[in-house]
Structures are given as C-alpha cells and as structure tokens.
Amino acid sequence: MKKLSIIYDVTALCPWNCAICCIGATSDKSCRNNELTQEQKLNVAHQVRELQENGYEVRMDLSGGELFTDIPAHTELLTALSEVLGRTKLGVSCSGYGIDSKLANFLGSTVHDVEMTMDVVPHHPYKLRPAAYSVAAAKAVALLKEAGCEVGLQTVASTYNSSYADALAVFAWACANGVDNWSILRFFPSGRGADYPEAAMTDAQCEAYVHMVQEMVDSLPVGHKPEVDFHYLMPGHKKYTNICRCVRHSIGILPNGDVVACFWALDSSTGAVDPKFLLGNVKDNSLLEILNGEKARYWFDCEHCCELGSGSTPERSVA
C-alpha cells in the first residue's frame, strides 16, 4: 500500500481574514464563485475511493478557509468521506468558528480528530491574528472534549510568538483544558504570509525554540500533558528532515479543485509559485489520473531536499 496524506482546503471563505493565511482566505463571499460545487466536492470522495481501490492508503484532513462557514454542505461532505475512509483516517482543521454541541457531537462520531490553531493564549494580542481568533478555539475545545473528540491545538511558531512566556502560556492552557495533542508548526511565508518574511525563523532559531519547548514540557509539574509533536521541518528534534515529500507522501487540493504537489508552494495571490507544483484539477481528471500523470511523475522520480529551501516553503503534512 502507498501511503498518501491529502489536505483538502474545501473553501476560501473565512470570517477571520488572518494576515498570514496560507491560502488567502477571506470573508468576502464572492470567493466562493471559484469554489467547487457541492456535487464536485462529493465527487472527490468517489475519487478517494478509487485511490484506495488502486493501492493507496489515504489519510485526509479537511480545512479551509473555515470549513464551518457552510455547515450543511460540509457535514455532508465529511459524512461521505468518513464512509469511504473510515473515521480513523479523517481529520478536520478549523478555527472553532460555528462549533456548538450539535456539531461537536457530529464530529465526535465522524472524524478521528479536530485541530485548531492557537498561536497565543486567548485575549493575548498577536500581530498576525485577529483578537478573537484564539478565543474561538478555546470555546470549541470544551464542547469537542465533551463530545468525545480527540482535540489538538496547533501553534504556528514565528518570530512574533517564540518567547518562553508565549510557549509556556499555550502549553499550560492545553494542559489545564485537557487538550490531547499540541502540534508545533514552523511559519513559512506562504499565501498572504509571503508579506511577512520577517516572521519566519531561521534554522538556528527553530532549533533553539524546539529545545526550549522540550525542556519546558519535561519540567512542568502538571497531571495532564498533551502529546507534543514538532513539524518535521523544524530542526532540533529526531523527526527533523528536509527531504522533499511532494506527491510521494502528500498532496493538497485547493478550493477551486487544483491539485498541488506542495501545499505551501503558494505565492501571495495563492497561486502555485511555479507551474511544476500544479498537478491538475479534480474537475478535469480524477486524483488517480493526476497521480499517474506526467506532472506527478516528475516528483516521483526525483530525490532531493525541499526545493523551497530553509526559509522556504514545505508542504503541510497531516501524517
């Protein structure tokens, strides 16, 4: 079986308008004009089934934009994908927006995990996110835990939130609120984040941050601690590697159906930074056809380090 992680950003609609949004999501509803129709979205589930029938073991994460700006459509899509993949192979990344007890209970029975971003603790000002962004995640955590969901928090580490005080505050909040997993991702200037190159940490800064967090986690005397996972492109821990994962390990699907080899290889207008990263579109070809195509073959055939380099842009992994 060939393992494949797929991140499907279903919509570009989002209430937050974050300064660093990697796909350029917006609260302007006209962004949905280029989005797949519901029928086309549901067809992605059929395409995933075809991958499974042809030797792929697929793990999928649905994200956005904000997935729950359209709860009826996207719960229908999650149901279809859960039936194809099984609950244990399906996850959701969201902000916490729109989650009430009914939606939390649905997610508890349909997906394996729900991950939300918390770069700083609620009510703490942060240059790169709106004021209420962490508050939405915090409110959703309690509802999701009550519904039996596995709950994760993701912190995107940048030069603006990499202090000991910021890291300790988020970790302590996660401990106190029963969060299961704390995932730490390196900030890359992808999408709108390309306008903030100064927010990207160097390899040396990342390594120092990793060691700081590891020591903090080991020494904090609390009863419950979430599992801590560092993204593989953060130097300083045993999982670190800069070997390219494009196509052989993961792909991304954008709201308009474009399939990209490297999810983070997006410019400030959220188009592929180079044509070779654009593999096809699910409206024109199935995922299996795209992965068997010539554009994908380039990535299967090459063995190299991340082309976008250090201070560059890797693909987001859901592994």
Where is each model-derived feature located?
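The −1 position to Zn-ligating cysteines in a subset of zinc-ribbon hairpins
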Residues: 13, 17, 243, 301
